[in-house]
């Protein structure tokens, strides 16, 4: 799912890119990324072996998540043998899992739903919850149909299950629970500071929208400023429609086209304040933690999971929030030495994610798809075809098998690919062919 016109600045793209770059180093993966051809994109540090497939997507996020172009996916499934769809649009999980025309469930493409967000009752009822009821239903059924659901936080998982219990029967909820896993994630490592502002500086890198409760945050800032305290607030992620409301004497509004420039600005600040009532992770807070900034946040949603245990600067009320901020400024507390911040790094996340994928395919390692072919004459033909070649074009091999009297129901691309692997052929992204090791 893409949120902004500049793909390179999209938070979902950044997470996927960083994970791809890490996982490729293991030598175990080939990645294809589906991106919107109608949005802006420039070549960045995405690993050169990652193959980009361009396709048209709706502009609106709400339209993207209910959009499933069967013609495009049919062509993708015809051309490539895919083991796993790392699905960032969880509403489509059941379609992607069962779209393939095959009779055998264990030969379908596996689907790993990657939950970035949840439609939950903690969102504004009239603007973001009630109008998205159809998306909520799709999220739940998409989660039910996937092989595995990955959640960055326990709170994110809890929200989905809470909604599912209102819609599904208990045994169906149990199916989602049994195919779900929670592991804290992250997409960067420690952020070092070359320079810090001399004036006590808060970064506000959250949206000025709805559930972020940004008005509450700036009401507290106003109280501090009117009490004579000296500080400034850098806004980096403001929604244009509300920027006029925060055009205050202590505020500086900055925008960045490059993510690296934004990170550099963040590294100059001391504290991150948020009043959000709905989160599934909160990348902006994780970034500040990895720069050892002080976090002042509600003692709820995902924040207790992101900070250390017994972290001292989570609040229960606006009055408590004011006292915490006042204490930070008066005592010039400009950093916090987190003991558990490694749990939020891309290094840790990539290790966890690698294990999750490996475990998902563990059973396949002990199964031979070639040996399960019933007709000996077919096995002989396939074996001869593969033993006389060092390079295989997947489409040619598929056509060869189909000429033996088979079709996609009994020989889907995923099965054909596994047979190639059993005969020590590996996929080479640059040539789009399989070569013998």
Regions found by a protein language model. Name each.
Residues 333-374, 408:
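A charged, aromatic-enriched C-terminal amphipathic alpha-helix characteristic of glycosyltransferases
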């Amino acid at each position: 799912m893409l949120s902004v016109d500049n793909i390179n600045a999209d938070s979902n793209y950044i997470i996927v890119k960083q994970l791809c770059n890490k996982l490729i180093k293991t030598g175990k993966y080939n990645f294809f990324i589906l991106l919107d051809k109608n949005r802006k994109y420039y070549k960045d540090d995405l690993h050169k072996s990652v193959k980009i497939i361009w396709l048209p997507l709706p502009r609106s996020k709400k339209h993207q998540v209910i959009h499933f172009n069967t013609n495009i996916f049919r062509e993708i499934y015809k051309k490539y043998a895919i083991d796993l769809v790392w699905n960032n649009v969880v509403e489509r999980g059941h379609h992607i899992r069962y779209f393939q025309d095959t009779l055998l469930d264990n030969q379908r493409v596996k689907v790993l739903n990657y939950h970035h967000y949840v439609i939950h009752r903690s969102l504004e009822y009239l603007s973001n919850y009630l109008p998205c009821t159809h998306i909520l239903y799709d999220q739940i059924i998409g989660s039910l149909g996937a092989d595995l659901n990955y959640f960055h936080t326990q709170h994110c998982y809890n929200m989905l299950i809470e909604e599912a219990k209102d819609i599904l029967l208990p045994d169906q909820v149990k199916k989602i629970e049994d195919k779900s896993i929670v592991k804290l994630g992250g997409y960067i490592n420690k952020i070092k500071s070359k320079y810090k502002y001399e004036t006590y500086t808060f970064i506000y890198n959250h949206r000025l929208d709805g559930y972020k409760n940004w008005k509450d945050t700036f009401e507290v800032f106003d109280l501090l400023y009117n009490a004579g305290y000296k500080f400034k607030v850098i806004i980096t992620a403001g929604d244009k429609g509300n920027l006029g409301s925060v055009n205050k004497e202590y505020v500086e509004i900055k925008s960045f086209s490059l993510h690296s420039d934004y990170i550099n600005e963040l590294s100059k600040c001391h504290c991150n304040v948020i009043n959000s009532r709905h989160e599934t992770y909160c990348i902006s807070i994780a970034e500040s933690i990895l720069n050892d900034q002080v976090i002042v946040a509600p003692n709820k949603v995902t924040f207790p999971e992101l900070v250390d245990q017994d972290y001292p600067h989570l609040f229960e009320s606006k009055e408590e929030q004011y006292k915490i901020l006042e204490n930070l400024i008066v005592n010039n507390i400009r950093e916090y030495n987190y003991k558990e911040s490694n749990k939020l790094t891309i290094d840790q996340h990539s290790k966890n994610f690698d294990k999750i994928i490996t475990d998902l395919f563990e059973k396949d390692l002990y199964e031979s798809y070639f040996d399960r072919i019933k007709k000996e004459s077919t096995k002989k033909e396939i074996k001869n075809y593969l033993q006389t070649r060092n390079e295989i074009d997947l489409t040619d091999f598929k056509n060869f098998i189909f000429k033996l009297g088979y079709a996609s129901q009994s020989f889907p691309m995923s099965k054909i690919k596994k047979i190639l692997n059993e005969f020590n052929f590996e996929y080479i992204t640059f040539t789009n062919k399989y070569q013998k090791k």
